[in-house]
């Protein structure tokens, strides 16, 4: 019991990080020579981690989320090799087995593998989303795809309204694609100063020059 507690308090965190890093490198090798797909999962992983941390995910859920984000598109390669296509449904059908093989080889626990399989097998399914890991993975994938697919703002807005649930994900969308919502006018400083001067004059306040 004491040994188990020591593992939980100390080396467990280090072991988790090392395993995620090994999975990261394994996925880069898996897609060697294909920078497009490597950079896609790198961005999805980074945004998933950011949203997960900002939303306060616990350590175990974050672990699953990071692993799933790294391998979420692993089925693309299998689909292309088998059928010459890599649409969302093909990814969901072929991805889980490929993810299981890689995660098993790297020593991931069975419960983690099962959840990652589920997420990989549903990451293009946007109804009945169960769990923050699932929700965040979908949001991160959308954020990256919005840019990579060159979607117009109207399509982005509609899908965000239907799919996005986390406050962090929504904020990133707004800052990334709708900055005009937050930009102040070019003369905001002058306008604010004029308002202050008008107020001072109305109140009859004397300010020494």
Predicted regions located by residue number:
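Divalent metal-dependent phosphate-bond-processing catalytic cores, especially two-metal-ion Mg2+/Mn2+ enzymes
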Residues: 2-14, 18, 32-42, 46-58, ...
